Amino acid sequence: MTRILLVKSIVKINMFDPKTQRLKDLFFKYPDRIQELENIFNKKTNVYIDYANVKPWATKLGWHIEPKRLKQFLDSFDNINVIKFYNGTLSGDIESEEFMQGVKKFGFDVHTKPVKIMRLSIDVSSIPPNSPDILKDFIRKPLLQKLKIEAIEFLNNQLKQFNKQGVFFIEDLKCNFDVEIGRDMLIDYDKNGIDNFVLWSGDSDFADPVRQLLNDSKKVAVFATARRVSTELGELVNNGLFIFDIQKIRNFICWKKEMESE
């Protein structure tokens, strides 16, 4: 009881009002991390989560971001105005549809659209063994140009083995929100009086809107993990961009069973 009262007394001085008992306990344990975030959220702040970019971070991190806990955590900061969540919905896929329904129930400002299913040919029956025509749909041009003929022939032979098994196409899921997020950030600056912008993504496509906000003296922070921030965004640190490593807040936002013990 004494511990909880102490936490509450500290909270009153700050902008952090924990929404759950777990957050209260973690606040008491990691006050410096909360203070760092309060400095980022020091004025009216909007958060933009590019979930298609964020979800794969689990492989690198070794732990998963739990949307419900993330929402509770961010809601605990008084200056957070809205938390916008961008993610595609795969029509007819129960898991995808239920996930998005759950996100809406958590109270996020949800932005979604149908995931496009692209069928890409891997049929090499009509091209020479050393042709890059099929591979160019899967390998970026700068890298493809550096591959030796032997490498191209090897990869085409691998595709040929798939063809022998009756596989001539693969499906690629596409649903990009770069344009929508960049647009919304600029609209929120121009019309909604937002002072601070927090982007959960390390994608290079956000470099232009982030640069514009920084040039207009707005505070912008990218929340990401090590080596998941593009070179284009990283270069904007010299312009005032702040990069926050989400590893610092693991226990606040991860699955309960993945919490670190100290």
Predicted feature residues:
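Domain-level signal for Mg2+-assisted phosphodiester chemistry and nucleotide/NA-binding surfaces
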Residues: 9-154, 170, 214-228
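Leucine-biased recognition of intrinsically disordered, low-complexity hydrophobic segments
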Residues: 5-6
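Nuclease catalytic cores that cleave nucleic-acid phosphodiester bonds
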Residues: 112, 117-262
